[in-house]
Swiss-Prot record:
Activated by 3'phosphoglycerate, inhibited by orthophosphate. Allosteric regulation. InterPro entries: ADP-Glc_PPase, ADP_Glu_pyroP_CS, NTP_transferase_dom, Nucleotide-diphossugar_trans, Trimer_LpxA-like_sf. Its EC number is 2.7.7.27. The keyword Nucleotidyltransferase applies. This is Glucose-1-phosphate adenylyltransferase small subunit, chloroplastic/amyloplastic. GO terms for biological process: glycogen biosynthetic process; starch biosynthetic process. GO terms for molecular function: ATP binding; glucose-1-phosphate adenylyltransferase activity. The lineage of its organism: Eukaryota, Viridiplantae, Streptophyta, Embryophyta, Tracheophyta. Prominently expressed in the leaves. A lower level expression is seen in the roots.
Length: 489
């Protein structure tokens, strides 16, 4: 359960609506031989139509060969998730619950499936049991039909005679499993993060990569000056080719990273508002290029964003930017996680919507009954499946699966992650007889007259033995915690 500093027995969470608009111009390129990286004869001009690169709903993609046979999706599960602790105490970061019914990993997997990419690996090395269980239950082993041999598989870090160490970074994680990835007869690898919230058509991303004859294509997010200092920025030439990188620049270095974003499809007005482009940590990399970069050019590089991609630019590879102008959020901290979840309750239009029929978000079928609300006052909230809510007040909150909320509770600006199971009547009677608290919210047991309001506006506190943490002023009740009756946090 996560709660802000001004809520009463509350926790928060939000999701957001996304859309994107991209376009391109005529581009002329010269080629680099993928394996040897020597300059060869120049190619004929390549025309990238605005529709082809656009992420608008009216545009069409004509990939040949199609993505289901020619693209391998690789989702990086991230590190230990220390900034999301205690949510990552017993689970990998991609397995953290999201939007009442989902988990973070459902976002990139659903984007892949909606983009006709059905061969997907998820790399992880921390607390992967719940992630593995969720993926095996949510996604069939023959997705896309037997012809396309679709799958979603978890690859956990493992030691071997060649690699005695755990994953040292994003690039090292991919390098350790290159022996498996290169067995697939594909043209490109699509590298994704497992902790981002957005909706994107990867087919158009791949199409832009092919039409510009790029070796690597980096998804780029337009930025204003205020946000730009927190991201790794890129500079492009008039063809959309990346020529320079800067990690979280400030002052004169920041000004030097301004680019003309109309090159990537923004209109003049928006280009003035957003004169910077930031890397989203999402890449399309041609297969031969990936093998050469990780094994021969940069065998000691551990990270894509800070080492491999800038290194590829320095040796003359064609590294293109692909603009994504839609909602995107990095769910890397408690504050970002809380705000993104509560964003789905935003009026009149949420930041991210799960109600998009054209590109749905998939998850594990749980076969839960409809939620039951008895004399409850609920406003501006999202309620998950299988909840029982009795005579209480809920405002601007997200209520997770199987949540049982009893009479008199007041929940505002709060995210409840839900419970893993229901307690039987016999269990509840037994607990009541010995003075204990029945399960209710997210496997946490919260007694009568408890107030979780952070009235002192504490910003940081670690009270794990008491069952809660405070980060950025947001109170998080940990899983399986028991908060005794009358407690004030």
């Amino acid at each position: 359960i996560t709660v802000p500093s001004t809520s009463s027995k509350n926790l928060q969470n939000s999701l957001a609506f996304s859309s994107s608009s991209l376009s391109g111009d005529k581009i002329q390129t010269t080629s680099f031989l993928n394996r040897r990286y020597c300059r060869i004869s120049s190619r004929a001009p390549i025309v990238v139509s605005p529709k082809a690169v656009s992420d608008s709903k009216n545009s069409q993609t004509c990939l040949d060969p199609e993505a289901s046979r020619s693209v391998l999706g690789i989702i990086l599960g991230g590190g230990a998730g220390t900034r999301l602790y205690p949510l990552t105490k017993k689970r990998a970061k991609p397995a953290v619950p999201l939007g009442a019914n989902y988990r973070l990993i459902d976002i990139p997997v659903s984007n892949c499936l909606n983009s006709n990419i059905s061969k997907i690996y998820v790399l992880t090395q921390f607390n992967s049991a719940s992630l593995n269980r969720h993926l095996s239950r949510a996604y069939a082993s023959n997705m896309g039909g037997y012809k396309n041999e679709g799958f979603v598989e978890v690859l956990a870090a493992q030691q071997s005679p060649e690699n005695p160490n755990w994953f040292q970074g994003t690039a090292d994680a991919v390098r350790q499993y290159l022996w498996l990835f290169e067995e697939h007869n594909v043209l490109e690898y699509l590298i994704l993060a497992g902790d981002h919230l957005y909706r994107m058509d990867y087919e158009r991303f791949v199409q832009a990569h092919r039409e510009t004859d790029a070796d690597i294509t980096v998804a780029a997010l337009p930025m204003d000056e205020k946000r730009a200092t927190a991201f790794g920025l890129m500079k492009i030439d008039e063809e959309g080719r990346i020529i320079e990188f800067a990690e979280k620049p400030k002052g004169e270095q920041l000004k030097a990273m301004k680019v003309d974003t109309t090159i990537l499809g923004l209109d003049d007005e928006r280009a003035k508002e957003m004169p910077f482009i930031a890397s989203m940590g999402i890449y399309v990399i041609s297969k031969d290029v990936m093998l050469n970069l990780l094994r021969e050019q940069f065998p000691g590089a551990n990270d894509f964003g800070s080492e491999v991609i800038p290194g590829a630019t320095s040796i003359g590879l064609r590294v293109q930017a692909y603009l994504y102008d839609g909602y995107w959020e990095d769910i890397g901290t408690i504050e970002a996680f809380y705000n993104a979840n509560l964003g789905i309750t935003k009026k009149p239009v949420p930041d991210f919507s799960f109600y998009d029929r054209s590109s749905p978000i998939y998850t594990q079928p749980r076969y839960l009954p409809p939620s039951k609300m008895l004399d409850a006052d609920i406003t501006d909230s999202v309620i998950g499946e299988g909840c029982v809510i009795k005579n209480c007040k809920i405002h601007h909150s997200v209520i997770g699966l199987r949540s049982c909320i009893s009479e008199g509770a007041i929940i505002e600006d709060t995210l409840l992650m839900g419970a893993d199971y229901y307690e039987t009547d016999a269990d509840r009677k037994f607990l009541a007889a010995k003075g204990s608290v029945p399960i209710g919210i997210g496997n946490a047991r919260i007694g009568d007259d408890v107030k979780i309001i952070n009235s002192d506006n504490v910003q940081e506190a670690a009270r794990e033995t008491d069952g809660y943490f405070i980060k950025s002023g947001i109170v998080t009740i940990i899983k399986d915690a028991m908060i005794p009756s009358g407690t004030v946090i």
